[in-house]
C-alpha cells in the first residue's frame, strides 16, 4: 500500500493487511474475540468498499487511476470517510474500543500501531485530495471524544483505545499543513504505545483494579510505566509534549488559533485518565499486605524491549 501509485494495488494491500490480522484477533476462540474479529472484518471491508467506490467514481469521471490524481469533490469526500473508518476517527470510531477489548494485548499493540501505517500512508499520499473542512471537524471530534469516553473506563485496553482515537485526531489535524510533523507524532506515539502495551503484558494487567497490586510486585516497572503514561499525556518535559507543542505552534502560524486553543483544552480530558492510570500503577497499594519477594529484576527478553522503548519515549 505504501509503495503503490495505482488505486487497485493500494486497495489490494489494505485487504491483505486486514486478512492477516484476523487470525491473531480470534486465536483465543473466546466469544468476545470472535465478536471483535467479526466487527473488525465488517468495518474494514466497508471502508475498503468505500475506498474502491471513491477511486472507481473518480476514474469514471476523470479517467485517472493514479492515487495522486483524485480530483472530483464527491470522490474526495468518500475517500476522506473511507480512510477515517480505516483508522478509527470519529464518527467512525465505534469498532476500535470493542476490537481492542476483545483482542490479546500483543494483538492490541499491532492494531494500535502497525496496522495504522497503511491508512496513514494513504493519508499522506492523498493529502491534497482530502476534504480539509471534513478532516478538521473529524480531528477535533476525535480529540474530544477520545478524552471524554476514556474518563469512565476501567479496562486498560479500552482506555488505550480511546487514547489512540485522541492521538489520531492530533495527527490528522496537522496533516494538511505539515505532513512531516504528522509522521513524527505517529512515530513517537508508536514508541510510547509499544512501551505501555509491553509493560501491561508483563505485569498481566487488564483492569485498573488489578493494576493496584503492580507496585508491590514490580516497583521498577511500575515507575517506568508511570513516566511513559505521563509522556503519552503530553506533560512537559517528557517526549510526548514535543509533538503537541509543535502542532499547536504550527496551527497558530496558520492563523488557526481558536482551533489550537480548543484542542489544547480538550487534551486535558485525556490527561485525567492518564493520571488515573499512573496513580493506580504507582501510588495505590492493595488493602491487605502480602509478604512476598519484590521482583526488582525479571530475566525475560521482553524486559529489554520495555527498557528500550521506555527510554526512547
Each language-model region and where it sits:
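Core, highly hydrophobic multi-pass alpha-helical transmembrane subunits of bioenergetic inner membranes
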Residues: 1-313
Amino acid at each position: 500500500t505504501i509503495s503503490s501509485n495505482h488505486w487497485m494495488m493500494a486497495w489490494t494491500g489494505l485487504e491483505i493487511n486486514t486478512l492477516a490480522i484476523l487470525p491473531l484477533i480470534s486465536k483465543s476462540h473466546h466469544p468476545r474475540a470472535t465478536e471483535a474479529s467479526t466487527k473488525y472484518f465488517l468495518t474494514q471491508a466497508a471502508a475498503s468498499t468505500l475506498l474502491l467506490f471513491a477511486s472507481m467514481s473518480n476514474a469514471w469521471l476523470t479517467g485517472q487511476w493514479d492515487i495522486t490524481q483524485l480530483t472530483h469533490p464527491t470522490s474526495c469526500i468518500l475517500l476522506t470517510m473511507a480512510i477515517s473508518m480505516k483508522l478509527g476517527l470519529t464518527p467512525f470510531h465505534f469498532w476500535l474500543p470493542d476490537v481492542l477489548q476483545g483482542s490479546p494485548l500483543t494483538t492490541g499493540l499491532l492494531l494500535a500501531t502497525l496496522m495504522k501505517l497503511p491508512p496513514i500512508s494513504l493519508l499522506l499520499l492523498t493529502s491534497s485530495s482530502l476534504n480539509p473542512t471534513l478532516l478538521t471537524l473529524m480531528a477535533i471530534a476525535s480529540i474530544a471524544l477520545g478524552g471524554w469516553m476514556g474518563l469512565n473506563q476501567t479496562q486498560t485496553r479500552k482506555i488505550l483505545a480511546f487514547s489512540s482515537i485522541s492521538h489520531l485526531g492530533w495527527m490528522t489535524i496537522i496533516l494538511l499543513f505539515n505532513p512531516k510533523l504528522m509522521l513524527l507524532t505517529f512515530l513517537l506515539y508508536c514508541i510510547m504505545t509499544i512501551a505501555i502495551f509491553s509493560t501491561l503484558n508483563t505485569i498481566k494487567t487488564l483492569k485498573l483494579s488489578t493494576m493496584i497490586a503492580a507496585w508491590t510486585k514490580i516497583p521498577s516497572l511500575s515507575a517506568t510505566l508511570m513516566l511513559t503514561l505521563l509522556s503519552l499525556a503530553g506533560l512537559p518535559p517528557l517526549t510526548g509534549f514535543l509533538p503537541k507543542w509543535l502542532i499547536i505552534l504550527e496551527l497558530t502560524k496558520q492563523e488557526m488559533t481558536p482551533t489550537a486553543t480548543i484542542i489544547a483544552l480538550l487534551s486535558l480530558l485525556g490527561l485525567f485518565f492518564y493520571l488515573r492510570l499512573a496513580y493506580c500503577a504507582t501510588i495505590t497499594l492493595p488493602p491487605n499486605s502480602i509478604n512476598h519477594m519484590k521482583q526488582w529484576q525479571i530475566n525475560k527478553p521482553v524486559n529489554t524491549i520495555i527498557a528500550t522503548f521506555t527510554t526512547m519515549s
